[in-house]
Amino acid sequence: MSVKSSIIKDFSEQYSAALKMTEDVIVKCKEELWQDYNHKEVISQLVYHILASADYSLCKTNNERDSFNRKYGESGFSFHDPNKNFSKNQLTDYLEEIKEKADNLFNNLHSQLEKEDKFLALP
């Protein structure tokens, strides 16, 4: 495995670990805290912010980044918008979309590097 392939593999594993930690927050957070507006930040809105940022980070080109639209809009980015509620199911579905997008991106990068490695290994 080349150094580049190893870096992509490590980055993929770390990205997956970060998504797993986010999933743990969604699954393990008690319902009474999930939409609790008595604190500085609302957990469901904070998780949405994390997911939208993760989704944005998977954009492959500047054009994709420039035209990026957050799945559920901007209002969840205030962290304390009583009009914006995100259910656990809603954010779990979004997380699954991001996982699939990340898997596709990292698999494509790995495949491209394998082809490059094979080409460079030719006599």
Language model region names:
Residues 1-10, 53-122:
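Short, helix-capping/interhelical loops that line the mouth of catalytic, cofactor-
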Residues 19-22:
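Conserved PLP-dependent catalytic core of the aminotransferase class-I/II
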Residues 34-43, 120-123:
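A glycine-rich, coil/turn loop motif that links secondary-structure elements
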Residues 49:
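Histidine-centered divalent metal-coordination motifs
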